[in-house]
């Protein structure tokens, strides 16, 4: 369960109600649509929740994350808390046997962390510069792990929970 699912359920509601939340999920393909590749049937898949319109200028340039008329599993369409979810074939990736469903459910926050890294630190050659991560929720912790994996050694973290700091210590950053 993502922290943003909680207010969608108990406070603010989703973008469009009623809707079944859950945007970080994985599963098994049990049915395919007419245009989908039948080889997806019964495959284990990870799901990307953003469904771009495919028509706007951003989509035509392949910049789907900038689509203004997008749909989103778990807030604009039923998501992963449902027993079954209708997901476009373009929004799934087949999982290797070595990846669990639980790990695959982290694909969306991993993509956010990688995107942040690429936006803030594009093509940096010097891995010795200082980097700070503000916030140690799931995405912040993933960002710390990815920065360390990319060779950054001087990583500063700002978090307010003991268990988050313990995770960072286990990653060898503090």
Feature roles, as predicted:
Residues 1, 24, 43-44, 58, ...:
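Residue-level marker of beta-strand positions
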Residues 2-6, 51-69:
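Local cysteine-cluster metal-coordination motifs and their immediate loop/turn environment
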Residues 10-57, 96-98:
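Glycine-rich beta-strand-centered segment in the early N-terminal region that forms part
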Residues 16-22, 73-77, 83:
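Short Gly/Pro-enriched turn/cap motifs at secondary-structure boundaries
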Residues 55-58, 76-86:
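A structural motif shared across PLP-dependent enzymes of the aminotransferase-like
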Residues 86-94:
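Structured surface patches comprising rigid loops and adjacent beta-strands/short helices at the edges
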Residues 99-174:
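Mid-domain Rossmann-like dinucleotide-binding core that forms the NAD(H)/NADP(H) cofactor-binding site
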């Amino acid at each position: 369960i993502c922290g943003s699912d909680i207010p969608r359920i108990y406070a603010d509601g989703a973008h469009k109600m009623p809707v079944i939340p859950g945007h970080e999920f994985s599963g098994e393909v049990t049915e395919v649509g007419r245009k989908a590749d039948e080889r997806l049937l019964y495959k284990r898949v990870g799901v990307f929740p953003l469904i771009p319109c495919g028509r706007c200028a951003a989509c035509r340039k392949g910049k789907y994350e900038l689509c203004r008329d997008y749909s989103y599993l778990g807030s604009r369409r039923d998501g992963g808390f449902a027993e079954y979810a209708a997901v476009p074939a373009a929004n799934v990736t087949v999982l290797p046997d070595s990846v669990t469903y639980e790990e695959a459910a982290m694909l969306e926050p991993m993509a956010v962390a990688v995107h942040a890294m690429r936006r803030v630190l594009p093509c940096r050659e010097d891995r010795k510069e200082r980097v700070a991560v503000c916030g140690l929720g799931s995405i912040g912790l993933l960002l710390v792990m990815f920065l360390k994996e990319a060779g950054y050694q001087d990583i500063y973290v700002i978090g307010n929970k003991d268990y988050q700091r313990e995770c960072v210590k286990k990653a060898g950053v503090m």
